[in-house]
Design a protein with these regions (language model features):
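Active-site microenvironments in enzyme catalytic cores
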Residues: 2-136
Length: 138
């Protein structure tokens, strides 16, 4: 199944992409099978947008072997934060700040895996962790 957030006119909705159509979902996108509406849009008539409205973006560092420089991977993940506007939608331009260009900062294009937590918790067991996710996005 392929889910998306999309803009149709001034409305923002969740939808399921089926072929060349987007079927609108109700607000409960976590369980799409029970939340499809009877409204559909041609994929060419909507704008696909960022999969989330980010508030807090927590990232994990040193998760690429090439970034470790021969050192062993850390035993405990090393989180850091990114600005909310670092998440963009399909086809949006990646804007490199002019200061980074002027200072010849090396940019590192990377594919990212986004895990959207839908259910809170504390001290969650590894075997139960996936049940707390509402969306996995690449």
């Amino acid at each position: 199944m392929k889910y998306t957030r999309f803009k149709s006119g001034s409305n923002i909705n969740w939808g399921e992409i089926i072929g060349d159509e987007v079927i609108e979902l109700s607000d409960n996108y976590i369980n799409p099978d029970s939340s499809k509406t009877n409204t559909s849009h041609s994929l060419s008539d909507v704008e696909l947008i960022s999969p989330v409205t980010p508030g807090k973006v927590v990232a994990i560092g040193l998760n690429y072997k090439s970034h470790l420089g021969g050192k062993p991977a850390p035993e405990v993940p090393e989180p850091f934060y990114k600005l909310p506007d670092t998440i963009i939608g399909p086809g949006e331009n990646i804007v490199i700040p002019k200061e980074a260009i002027a200072e010849k900062v090396k940019m590192q294009p990377e594919a990212e895996l986004c895990l959207v937590i839908g259910k809170g918790g504390k001290r969650i067991s590894q075997s139960d962790a996936l049940s707390h996710l509402s969306l996995i996005h690449i």
